[in-house]
């Protein structure tokens, strides 16, 4: 018989840097999950990501206090910031530009994000990421 799901916990945790301090500790401690076990497994599974990159994770907690988790790809805004070499987006995106990205960089990000998006069409995903880039105040070339 399948285990009964107690809760779903959504977090963004830095790749390879999960530790029991907030936000991981309190979120998982509330559910009675072994926090150190999660941190150890998460860090092992994210060691091929760039260290410190925020990784969304969805943790399924079962009634017997066991858990499973799904690691998603980093948010598009983080990947765009990295591609443009900026720390954050513009305060007023329509009025100020903070950096430049090329359409090929956007397409590359779309290919990374295809597993997490609700479409398999690379062009549609590219347009979605293009919208994110524009709302961050980035100029798209090409």
Curated annotation (Swiss-Prot):
PTMs per UniProt: One or more lysine residues are methylated.
GO terms for MF: large ribosomal subunit rRNA binding; structural constituent of ribosome
Signal peptide region: none
Matches recorded under SUPFAM superfamilies: Ribosomal L11/L12e N-terminal domain, Ribosomal protein L11, C-terminal domain
Pfam (any one): Ribosomal_L11_N
A Gene Ontology term for the protein's cellular component: cytosolic large ribosomal subunit
Domain of life of the source: Bacteria
Example of a GO biological process term: translation
Entry keywords, A to Z: Methylation, Ribonucleoprotein, Ribosomal protein, RNA-binding, rRNA-binding
InterPro entries the UniProt entry points to: Ribosomal_uL11, Ribosomal_uL11_bac-typ, Ribosomal_uL11_C, Ribosomal_uL11_C_sf, Ribosomal_uL11_CS, Ribosomal_uL11_N, Ribosomal_uL11_N_sf
Known function: Forms part of the ribosomal stalk which helps the ribosome interact with GTP-bound translation factors.
Subunit structure and binding partners: Part of the ribosomal stalk of the 50S ribosomal subunit. Interacts with L10 and the large rRNA to form the base of the stalk. L10 forms an elongated spine to which L12 dimers bind in a sequential fashion forming a multimeric L10(L12)X complex.
Family listed: Belongs to the universal ribosomal protein uL11 family.
Record's protein name: Large ribosomal subunit protein uL11
Gene responsible for this protein: rplK
């Amino acid at each position: 018989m399948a285990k009964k799901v107690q809760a779903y916990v959504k977090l963004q945790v830095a790749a390879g840097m999960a530790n029991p301090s907030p936000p991981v500790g309190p979120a998982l401690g509330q559910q009675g999950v072994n926090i150190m076990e999660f941190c150890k497994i998460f860090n092992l599974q994210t060691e091929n990501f760039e260290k410190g990159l925020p990784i969304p994770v969805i943790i399924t907690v079962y009634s017997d206090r066991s858990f499973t988790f799904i690691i998603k790809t980093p948010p598009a805004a983080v990947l765009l910031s990295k591609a443009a070499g900026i720390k954050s987006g513009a305060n007023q995106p329509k009025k100020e530009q903070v950096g430049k990205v090329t359409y090929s960089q956007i397409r590359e990000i779309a290919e990374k994000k295809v597993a997490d998006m609700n479409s398999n069409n690379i062009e549609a995903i590219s347009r979605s990421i293009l919208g994110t880039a524009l709302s961050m105040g980035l100029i798209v070339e090409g």
